[in-house]
């Protein structure tokens, strides 16, 4: 792998008004025909193997091509953009495609894929997925929803996450719940027996029977995690037929109503959104809260190294656990939330089949596991559970079962703006300025006045 400057980098710098570009290149052995593919990737120290695995995949695909007797070989050049986040990166790339330029392949957050599809910049790949089951056949079926637009599939899921409700078993025991009840909570949640309001009831009992200050905590800023609660009440935020943002007043009011009840019953702090992230983590991991609505990566990033929770699987589950996001009503569907980063192929690529095959090879189980275990992400394939490295990273292996029921953010580029409105309304509910119904009305009024093509029901 070597650093080079290319015409692509110069083009991007000119189009985007400056910046820096790092290009990594894979060079094939001499062949009659070299197909050069350029990959756009955000410069992201938290996920360096996303582009690096594509570079590695070139060698694997070239071997496949040689074995097939083909005279074609692929070479990969990676442009790493300096964008601070995936939203900014997607907007920059849309501008580059908009002036008739751009890469052959790109990496993006999944909710942006339909923006590229709508502008004609992303290649539909359904037929290639069906043609090459050796590349795509064992990717978890649920993950394909994250790269689907109204008329087809336009990307390949590169990784996944799991979000859940962590809970403190020690506090539940102190509150009088027996081990049979505590250990059955995950299964009862998945079966639809344990509901969102049951979580409030459990948290309320913990506060009344123990010294814990908090019942349920969630992130203090805008993000995906609390969206799980909205999805439990049936809010999917996208119209399946058109991909437009969808707001359903009754379902929004029901979800905000859960937070409202949590605050009124004293289990969700009214100042949750004013607290520091570290203070919320500390409260949960030091035994001062019953539930923590967050994601699996927090164990390896904070719980184990910072707060000393046991790394051993058996010792961890003796006193800690997690459940999926419960259903709103008994018999309903529990859920989880994941936010995949994805690979995609540009519509203008000259060798679309080779491009898709390359990304298929970049999604090989061993390469994806390299990324998963070094970044605390879930793998995308069932066979990764058999990799000793993945099995050793037991939080990932255990949380993978949630991919069967996982849900996603809406594949709409305006969802980030909508989420900001939802978060503002959530602050209003928790501080007592808005009722659940008023919060729903606020979200709909703000979204319809500031966003485009919002469907309201």
Task: Label the predicted regions.
Residues 150-159, 163-165, 191-245, 251, ...:
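Extracytoplasmic/periplasmic solute-binding protein
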Residues 126-139, 181-191, 235-255, 304-315, ...:
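Short, solvent-exposed loop/beta-turn-alpha elements that line the ligand-binding surface or hinge
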Residues 5, 14-118, 130-133, 175, ...:
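Conserved N-terminal structural module of periplasmic/extracytoplasmic solute-binding proteins
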Residues 108-164, 197-198, 317-326, 389, ...:
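Hinge/lid segment of periplasmic solute-binding proteins
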Residues 33, 69, 171, 175, ...:
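Extracytoplasmic/periplasmic substrate-recognition and gating elements
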Residues 318-327, 372-428, 453-457:
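Long, aromatic- and glycine/proline-rich binding clefts that accommodate carbohydrate-like moieties
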Residues 198-205, 241-277, 321, 325, ...:
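Glycine-centered hinge/linker elements that transmit conformational signals in sensory
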Residues 95, 103-104, 134-172, 214, ...:
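A structural signal for short loop-to-beta-strand junctions that line the ligand-binding cleft
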